[in-house]
Amino acid sequence: MAEDLEIRDSGKIAAAFASASMPLAEPRTAQDFETAAQAVWDSLPEQFRNALGNVMVQVVDFADAETLDALRIYNPYNLLGLYHGAGLPFKSVWDPARLPDRIFLYRIPILSYADLNGERTDRVIRHVLIHEIGHHFGFSDADMELIEASA
């Protein structure tokens, strides 16, 4: 399972943010966050969304303990998103049937990151979502850093 996991580990969230009592950036409710994530998804070019096929986007508060352990991430605030599946370059028509690939957006770490860095939450959601979509298309973290640096 660990070999199928790709991570987005921001590395910028301090351990001090492990307290749930910290102030969070807008949106504050889970429904507001899902609405913002849906708006980001809808803003992506249609051709791009269509190329994703049956990839599911799921919003959860934090990564589960099993995922954090598998990735050796000890502070749950350090994982903003995760692509779970086999990227397109690694799939074959001969593969056995699988569950749909999934992109997880971790709501509370994203809100914390936005607040800590003075960024709009929708911009952080967009960055994380596009980053995880990049993994679906076979890009590594290093590949995406090069793309972002040249943009």
Segments from the language model and where they lie:
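N-terminus-biased detector of the onset of the functional/mature region
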Residues: 150-151
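Active-site rim/adjacent substrate-binding subdomains
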Residues: 2-124, 136, 140-145
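Catalytic glutamate of the conserved HExxH
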Residues: 128, 132-136
